[in-house]
């Protein structure tokens, strides 16, 4: 093993979580390798719901437009009843974008297209996943992780400061750490398949026998080459014929129709639904993220989105510690993300029970815009402050005007791997500039003008308030005019030191 074999981060698993982390580390200049034991990229549509909060993450990572162009909005669902009647219903509550929430509803994007867009973005940043490369062993000490990789019959030993397991529900990393994965199998087995077919239109999501766990079956039109995602519960025991002929027979049995013919199957899977949560997200210098840390039933479209946001939370913290921030900053990853996963597990399981009763409509609860880290060790807040937006909340967008008269958005200010300090009508000299912190003054004579009072009304700020927004778009701190010392201490604790302090 040579110095060339030493990297900052080894990411094991090139799905949505691993790709998100890789993109974030790449734009921060962190050295890493992203390995994937499979020989080729995942080719199924499985995790197809992209929630509004994840779209905000993708905007920051530079891929939201490509993701949106790869998919579309959820179609209405056409419910076919046993008496031959049918009705069309909305699957998603209508919600128009507003300045504070620019993405109102989820998008339907096949997972393999989402991951393709992520790989393309990673390539723009000069990196690529290493397919066919497996992690076969690792051990750690106080300074890093020694990992043994196997690729095409050849083995290599490398050294990394940190190892991240994003290798799915059957995670090798989690099992090697002996981290428990408690939870339960939910007593539901289902199939999901990407198919082409004849006999159904592409303008609606077709669902037969809604609410029946014995005979329900559905066909959701996808954007890719006229295909559909076919879904349905199946018996807990026994083999399932996932060929075109087998799925055609299953369709005829459940719908009573012989005109729906499955012509081809590009990907198919039969799986048991589980709800499980890792006992720990961190063991020393090894972390778990995505499905390696939590598995959800697919109801509500939470799994992929939660995985992306795990990685988005972890990436900036790894980069900060590698640049000199206190190691304890990494403890906040599990502190913040494990409760979110526990909540999402509960939500997805409740939605599964709703589906069994025939209720499939989804509202704000699945959009992940209200997820926050209130009470986190990284949330600095005056306990007396009463407002809608407090430290730990998602930082909303708002429309402003630049000092030169040009339109401006908060999200454009947040975009990138930096922290953002918003100073509202601050008259006194405040914090010194430093690397990694962008300071924006809002108000007359400032960098930005709150000409429509959107910022003031959304954040409920008073003159002299300072709002610190983290690199992942959450409010880290809100302090008033006289609390600059507390804010300075906070910045020091997350590695944002002034020039002189940073050199010490």
Task: Describe the residue ranges of each PLM region.
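Active-site-adjacent segment of FAD-dependent monooxygenases/related oxidoreductases
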Residues: 43-123
